[in-house]
């Protein structure tokens, strides 16, 4: 037994209707799903390698392990290609309270969750930013940088190597 450690946070969807979170397919370190996807904090900027496999929510930092940076609220930003690729929820039943106990049946096309307000849709990046309370120019700048990195095949900010796909230049998002 040991009590000198705690599990760190993870990036997941929390909705008012359920006490626990929903894991997102795009954030799973081993999944490759069509479409452009990034996670931003309340300043509209990326803050980590979204696909990094954490160890109980911890990441290596200068010879030690620290909790993954998780500014709140966080927003999973994705394009229509990702929305259409199948359920964004990782419903694999082998882990997590929501998967095992709640057994929520996420829709195959994500539209039921869009209708519930769990997913916010914007026709343009600035439109989406306004709807989710972000600075439109900050989010637009972040996506422009991500798209340039994805097109070059190198994430110059955080070294992400999986799902290096730009977000579409056409909405919706």
Can you say where each PLM-predicted feature lies in the sequence?
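Residues forming the flavin
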Residues: 1-144, 148-173
């Amino acid at each position: 037994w040991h009590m000198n450690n705690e599990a760190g946070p993870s990036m997941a969807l929390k909705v008012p209707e359920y006490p626990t979170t929903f894991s997102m397919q795009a954030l799973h370190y081993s999944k490759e799903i069509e479409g452009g996807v990034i996670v931003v904090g309340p300043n509209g900027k990326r803050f980590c390698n979204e696909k990094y496999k954490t160890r109980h929510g911890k990441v290596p930092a200068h010879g030690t392990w620290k909790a993954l940076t998780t500014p709140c609220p966080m927003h999973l930003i994705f394009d229509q290609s990702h929305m259409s690729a199948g359920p964004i929820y990782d419903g694999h039943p082998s882990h997590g309270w929501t998967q095992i106990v709640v057994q929520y049946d996420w829709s195959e096309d994500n539209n039921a969750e869009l209708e519930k307000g769990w997913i916010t849709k914007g026709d343009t990046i600035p439109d989406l930013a306004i709807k989710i309370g972000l600075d439109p120019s900050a989010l637009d700048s972040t996506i422009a940088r991500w798209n340039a990195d994805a097109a070059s095949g190198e994430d110059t900010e955080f070294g992400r190597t999986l799902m290096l796909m730009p977000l579409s230049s056409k909405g919706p998002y």
